[in-house]
Structure formats: structure tokens, C-alpha cells
């Protein structure tokens, strides 16, 4: 079927675009009456107002014409459990709760350009994705990516952290690392050349082979100053001090990570947004920056499966307010680790600036709250 357009005048102009790859009624069911069409799919002045489950093709794949849709409006797909893929190459803005509760959504394609719909700075209002746009979608969904489009890797890595994507679909993953990296039985044990990470371009990204399951003790610690991001789809364990004092490290993407050792990310003042959907155990001082000159910049941290948090894990001097997502109340060690530490049981989160904790209503019931707060965290519910 050729691309078709159906225009209705109902006091305002509604435009519905069928897909170029549309194959008869199996691809897209068009309701028979104008009233039903207007309630299922609405596009007004380039804004997708709604796209109901009844209009979703039987294969679950929705494609939006880039000439017709530039914004996905608030709640446009909310609760659509039939949606499996969304292809929207012309979209630059995604409003609140746009895909909230789309529990079958596994692939998102915004055209795989230089960057996803994400503002690089707060002053840029031409492109954005609302904080809760993808809440309630699978943690193992993927975002399309094209390494030949001159992409900004750092913006993509921040986007998939904040909006809970497991992979960049299309990223080039090496089958092995150069000889400067020592790997044995799936464990990255050491880096033999201190210049191994030089010449990685303005993004400073290291992409690990998927067969690397563990990063050994102190491998990257205190060695590299132009190392901005690391991407490893297979990493499950990180041993003590692996990234300690990597002062330039901004993004860490390990979607299968289950445990991290002591001081793994200590004195990493430039870390910004992290999502570890399967992380269960965090050892002592893992993100601690007590006494550091540079403040902590972590503004977003998602740990929905964490069960055990060691002492002093997030203690330090913060520059910004932090948003943290947790599941049920974890076991937290509040033991002071030095004599001059706060003795009031706050040391593990000491120094955080008015932190916000997001939990589901069912998980909230597991928390012990004092005056509506949990160790200084204001509680908000994910609904």
C-alpha cells in the first residue's frame, strides 16, 4: 500500500498517516466511523495527541510520518500494551507519560540521528523527553543507533540511562579488545598500556566485547583522564576499585550488572546519570567522594533491584539534587567508617542535596518512614 493520508475536519484538522510498508488490514485497522477515528488517533498541528490500542497494527509496530508528527503528546500511548515498536523519525519532543505503561514496548526508533530527542542544555527548548515518558516500559528495550551518523555518544548514553534502555541497537561492538587489554576467561584483568584509551575521539568511549562478564580489581583506577564513557552489554560483576578516581568518567552502561565491589566509582566527580536495572549488591563506599575537591554530579540513579547497600556508598559533597529510583526497601549499612563521620545513621547518604526517592505504591509500603521521609529522601510514587 502506498503512503496514504486521511484528513478530517472536526473543528480542527486531524491527520492520520498509514505506513509505507502497510500490508492491507493486517497492518493497520482503520475504524469505520469518523467519531471512532478521532477518538483512536489524533494529530493536531504536528502533535500526536492520542494513539489508542485499537488503532495499533496487529504486529504492534507503529510508524509515524516524519512530515506529520514532530511531538508525541502527554500520555499519547499511555497504557497501550499492544505497542511493541515505535518508529518516529521526525519526533523532537516527547511529553509527560507519553509511553507510560507500554509494557510490551521493546524497540524505539527516532531516526538514529546525531542525538535522540534530548536537550543538551536546559536552555534548549527545541527538543526534550519528559522524565516519566517511558516509565512502566521494559528495562530491556532498545534504542536505534547509527554510528555512521556522527552521533554524540555521550548524549545517547545519558538518554538510555535516564529512560531505561538496555542497548543501543546498531552500536558497533568489537569481538575482542586490542592487545593492550588483558582478558582471561571473560574477565578484564588489567590494562598493560596507560595510553590504551588515548585517541578515542571527542566522546572518549570504550565499548567492550559482549563476552566480558567481569571487570577486575583496579583495572581502570586512577589511570585515565580522558576516559568519558564505557559500554558493556555483558558485564555482570565489577571488583574493588575498578574505576576509582576516573575523574573524567561521565557515563557507565552495564545493563546486566549484578554486583559491584568496594570503592568502584569513588572520586568519580563527573558521573551524571546511571541505570543498573539488575544490580543487587553494592559494597562499601562504591560511589563515595568524601573529602574530594570536585563535587558529585550524579543527578539520576536507578537501582530497582538493589537489595544490599554498603556503608558510605553515596556520601560526599554534591553539586546538584539527585533523583533515585529503588524497588522495595534495601538493607543499608549506616555504620560510620571514620571517627569524624556523622554518628546519626545518615552517613551512607550524607551530603546529598534534598534527594528524591521514587518508588511504586506497593514498594513504598516496605519503607520505614520518619515524618514522611526515608533518611532524608522525599518520597514520590511512580504511578
What is each stretch, according to the model?
Residues 3-6, 18-40, 46:
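Bacterial Sec-dependent N-terminal signal peptides
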Residues 121-123, 132-136, 159-163, 265, ...:
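A structural signal for leucine-rich repeat
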Amino acid at each position: 500500500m502506498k503512503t496514504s493520508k486521511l484528513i478530517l475536519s472536526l473543528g480542527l484538522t486531524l491527520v492520520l498517516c498509514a505506513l509505507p510498508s502497510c500490508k492491507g488490514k493486517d497492518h493497520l485497522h482503520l475504524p469505520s466511523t469518523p467519531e471512532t477515528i478521532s477518538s483512536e488517533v489524533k494529530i493536531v498541528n504536528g502533535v500526536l495527541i492520542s494513539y489508542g490500542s485499537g488503532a495499533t497494527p496487529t504486529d504492534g509496530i507503529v510508524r509515524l510520518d516524519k512530515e506529520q508528527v514532530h511531538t508525541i503528546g502527554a500520555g499519547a500511548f499511555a497504557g497501550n500494551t499492544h505497542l511493541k515498536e515505535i518508529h518516529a523519525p521526525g519526533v523532537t519532543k516527547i511529553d509527560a507519560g507519553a509511553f507510560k505503561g507500554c509494557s510490551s514496548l521493546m524497540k524505539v526508533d527516532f531516526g538514529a540521528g546525531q542525538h535522540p530527542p534530548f536537550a543538551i542544555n536546559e536552555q534548549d527548548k527545541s527538543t526534550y523527553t519528559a522524565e516519566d515518558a517511558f516509565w512502566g516500559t521494559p528495562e530491556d528495550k532498545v534504542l536505534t543507533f547509527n554510528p555512521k551518523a556522527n552521533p554524540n555518544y555521550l548524549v545517547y548514553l545519558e538518554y538510555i540511562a535516564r529512560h531505561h534502555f538496555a542497548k543501543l541497537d546498531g552500536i558497533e561492538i568489537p569481538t575482542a579488545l586490542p592487545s593492550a587489554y588483558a582478558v582471561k576467561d571473560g574477565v578484564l584483568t588489567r590494562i598493560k598500556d596507560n595510553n590504551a584509551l588515548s585517541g578515542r575521539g571527542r566522546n572518549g568511549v570504550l565499548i567492550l566485547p559482549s563476552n566480558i562478564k567481569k571487570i577486575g580489581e583496579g583495572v581502570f583506577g586512577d589511570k585515565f583522564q580522558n576516559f568519558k564513557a564505557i559500554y558493556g552489554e555483558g558485564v555482570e560483576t565489577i571488583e574493588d576499585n575498578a574505576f576509582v578516581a576516573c575523574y573524567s568518567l561521565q557515563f557507565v552502561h552495564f545493563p546486566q550488572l549484578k554486583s559491584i565491589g568496594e570503592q568502584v566509582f569513588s572520586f568519580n566527580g563527573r558521573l551524571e546519570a546511571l541505570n543498573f536495572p539488575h544490580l543487587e549488591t553494592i559494597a562499601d563506599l562504591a560511589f563515595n567522594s568524601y573529602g574530594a575537591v570536585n563535587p558529585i554530579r550524579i543527578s539520576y540513579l536507578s537501582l530497582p533491584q538493589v537489595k544490599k547497600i554498603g556503608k558510605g556508598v553515596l556520601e560526599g559533597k554534591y553539586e546538584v539534587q539527585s533523583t533515585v529510583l529503588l524497588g522495595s526497601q534495601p538493607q543499608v549499612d549506616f555504620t560510620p567508617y571514620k571517627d569524624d563521620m556523622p554518628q546519626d545513621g545518615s552517613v551512607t547518604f550524607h551530603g546529598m542535596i534534598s534527594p528524591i526517592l521514587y518508588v511504586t505504591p506497593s514498594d513504598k509500603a516496605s519503607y520505614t518512614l520518619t515524618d514522611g521521609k526515608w533518611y532524608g529522601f522525599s518520597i514520590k510514587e511512580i504511578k
